[in-house]
Design a protein with these regions (language model features):
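Acidic/serine-rich, low-complexity amphipathic helices located in mid- to C-terminal regulatory regions
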Residues: 123-131
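Hydrophobic faces of stable alpha-helices that mediate helix-helix packing
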Residues: 26, 30, 85, 92, ...
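All-alpha helical catalytic cores of prenyl diphosphate-utilizing isoprenoid enzymes
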Residues: 34-37, 52-54, 119, 133-229
Length: 328
């Protein structure tokens, strides 16, 4: 069973500027993902469809780049594991959200139903830790176990805060650190350690990854309100319809307190478009974009990158810049 896919931005830009080692390692990651998916038995077809749906492969890219050319099998294995965890979490998110589409493609939830999609997510999580256990990779097993718990905690915070326009920026950041930043952070740490990073540099790489992840989430939330469906793969204002309160909404309420009385439970496709326009009119989207850009700049100035090989650092900065370019 194959999983052909086009290589997305910002990965293409990095590949064009990298040496021969990086495309080869990414190909090994794709082969590893396909091998795991093919081993899922009756769920293999559903898993292959999820894999073919693609994505940016930013997390595996971060693993490989933080490891550098000497990361070897440990880096490839970590990259596969990180992407499998990401895939599993998305499948479960789609079940919780009752999402018909992801990246413009029907979800497993939509095509196969709640039970099968839930089981696929469970199988992806389990397969990740089976692979790591067989390799005796205790470090990756431990870190990704903690990360999986963080993902669940972040998802729970999102559910508990649904439709609550009283959420603060601090509430939002805490949720996103768990739900998004934790896996980016783990990717950078596992990659760095595969490449020989010591404790101090690993800590710096954790902060770098977390910063990239938070910026990624901020810009994704901006795009939900501003981006056309053909670009986002979902209807505009989907987060609002789901009751998910994001930083652009929080900043908009700070700028226009009259928005705080909106009843998100009463939104439909027409009224959500009007509300999205009202939020944009406050200037909140530009403010959140600026906050995300500042996060990217801070991440790129991390001391953990300063001690790297210049070419390795340049490629990591390309990935960071790619987060911004995708939303420009």
């Amino acid at each position: 069973m194959t999983s052909e896919r086009s290589i997305p931005e910002p990965v293409t830009a990095v590949l064009e500027g990298a040496g021969a080692w990086l495309p080869g390692e990414l190909a090994r990651v794709e082969a590893g993902l396909t091998e795991i998916i093919d081993g899922l038995g009756p769920l293999a077809a559903d898993g292959a469809a999820t894999l073919r749906a693609g994505g940016k492969r930013m997390r595996p890219m971060l693993v490989l780049l933080c490891a550098g050319p000497g990361g070897g099998e440990a880096a490839v294995r970590a990259a596969v594991a990180v992407e499998l965890i990401h895939m599993a979490s998305l499948v479960h998110d789609d079940v919780l959200d009752r999402a018909p589409l992801r990246r413009g493609i029907p979800t497993t939830y939509a095509t196969a139903g709640r039970e099968r999609a839930t089981t696929l997510g469970d199988a992806l999580f389990s397969s990740t830790f089976t692979m790591l256990a067989r390799a005796g990779d205790l470090r990756a097993t431990e870190l990704l176990s903690f990360t999986a718990v963080d993902l669940a905690r972040g998802e729970l915070l999102q559910r508990e805060g649904a439709y609550d326009l009283g959420l603060t920026a601090g509430d939002y950041e805490n949720r996103c650190r768990l739900k998004t930043g934790s896996l980016f952070s783990a990717a950078c740490v596992l990659g760095g350690e595969a490449g020989g990073a010591g404790p101090e540099q690993s800590e710096g790489l954790a902060d770098f990854g977390r910063g990239i992840g938070l910026a990624f989430q901020l810009l994704d939330d901006v795009l939900d309100l501003a981006g056309p469906p053909e670009r986002t793969g979902k209807a505009r204002g989907t987060d609002l319809l789901d009751g998910t309160v994001t930083l652009p909404v929080i900043r908009a309420i700070e700028l226009d307190p009259s928005l705080a009385v909106v009843d998100l439970n009463q939104l439909d496709e027409e009224s959500v478009a009007e509300l999205s326009d009202r939020i944009a009119a406050t200037g909140a989207l530009d403010q959140v974009r600026a906050e995300a850009l500042a996060m990217i700049d801070r991440a790129k100035s991390s001391p953990a990158l300063e001690s790297m090989d210049p070419e390795q650092r340049r490629l990591l900065e390309l990935v960071a810049d790619g987060v911004v370019q995708r939303y420009s």
